[in-house]
Amino acid sequence: MSESEYKIADGSGKFLQAVKDGRRMKDAQWSKGRILLSNKRIVLAGSEGKRNLPLSEVQGLSGRHDVNQTVAKVGNYVSIRMTNESVMLVSLGDNTETFESKLYGALLDQTELQVKHPAVEGGVVTDEQFERARIKVDESELSVAMSNGSFVSVELDDVGSAEAASLEVNGDTKPVLKVEHTVNRDTSVQTYFATDSHTASILESLLTKEAEKSQGSVELSETEKRVLMALYSGVSSFEIPDFLGMDVDEVESIFERLIEVDVLEEVRKRREVTMKTRGRNIASEAINEE
């Protein structure tokens, strides 16, 4: 390694190439060996030699690529999508998720970009401006240090959606990622991240992966949707009966039902509730249909 390169993770595992130049490798077999991650590259060292994957050529970490039954039998692996339309699969057994988190950190930590927070709050567009910021990734959150001295924490399991767009930012058109999450697990907001296409692709991989975990349709009544829309707009759970002109017992019953279907979560036994990512997605869709 050069003086500017340092080791981030090092372990034993297995790896294979699932896609080469855009073509699925149906006969691919796992190779056992050493897997090393530095701040500049991933090194895959096996009995057949050593392979280097420069981090600058990583486009993102995608979903499963079960090109054959041998691959499908492995429950946990990281799919590394490269710029040459190739995909490498890496598995470190029980340490795979930790490796994936460290890889995202190596790709994104201390990256400077422009952030608008909150761009949307409770469904209402704000007049906030884009500011310079730096980001840091760990296993549970994306931390954003703003140039004005403030900090924004995006809990990864709280991401409701991550939508790629192209917007004008300070006079230039840039790739922008619109990320829906909450502030203090309470108010729904959207934070906009503007950066170069390479960083945007990797950040989208991270946040889309988390957002997909909260997807799933739930059949709700119109009254239940009204309750969700009120919560989404920032109305306190204690204020719902008066705000919607409903009986307290009826609201309590709706809260019970929405907790059961994993749309709300209980905060205190006094029946204070807060929206989960699935609930925010449903409420947002219902508002758009109004």
Curated annotation (Swiss-Prot):
Keyword Kinase tagged: no
Q: Which BP terms does GO give this entry?
A: chemotaxis
Q: Which InterPro entries match?
A: CheF1/F2
- Keywords tagged on the record: Chemotaxis
Function summary: Involved in taxis signal transduction. Essential for the ability to control the direction of flagellar rotation. May have a role between CheY and the flagellum.
How does it associate, per the subunit comment?
Interacts with chemotaxis (Che) proteins as well as flagella accessory (Fla) proteins.
Q: What is this protein called?
A: Taxis protein CheF1
Which organism is this entry from? Halobacterium salinarum (strain ATCC 29341 / DSM 671 / R1)
From the broadest rank down, the organism's phylogenetic lineage runs: Archaea, Methanobacteriati, Methanobacteriota, Stenosarchaea group, Halobacteria
